[in-house]
């Protein structure tokens, strides 16, 4: 989260699930819905989770412990990518991509997107 804050990133894109076929694929680095978790000098509040067909959009509220910094970050997690394969169709991935582009435009930020 420190990198997100330092670079003022507003959008995170994730193309994997945390677990597939009972195996851990990546670390869950965010709190559960409506929960807050501290990560060093920042706290992350998972303000919203919206499930779409094939992906999840999360809206995080990030604050520094001294309350000097406050920012909103969106995470898009594609959940239909099969382990060791490719999706049967790209329609959900293309739809998520459109949402990501729209979100980048709405934030007005020129900060890098984290993938």
Swiss-Prot record:
Domain of life, per lineage: Eukaryota
A GO MF term: protein tyrosine phosphatase activity
Reaction(s) catalysed by this chain's protein: O-phospho-L-tyrosyl-[protein] + H2O = L-tyrosyl-[protein] + phosphate
Transmembrane segments: none
Domain Tyrosine-protein phosphatase: 1-115
Residues binding substrate: 83
Keywords assigned by UniProt, alphabetized: Hydrolase, Protein phosphatase
InterPro entries for the chain: Prot-tyrosine_phosphatase-like, Protein-Tyr_Phosphatase, PTP_cat
Transferase as UniProt keyword: no
Enzyme Commission designation: 3.1.3.48
Gene3D superfamilies for the chain: Protein tyrosine phosphatase superfamily (3.90.190.10)
PROSITE patterns registered for this protein in UniProt: TYR_PHOSPHATASE_PTP
Similarity field: Belongs to the protein-tyrosine phosphatase family.
Protein name: Tyrosine-protein phosphatase 18
Organism in which the protein naturally occurs: Styela plicata (Wrinkled sea squirt)
Gene transcribed to yield this protein: STY-18
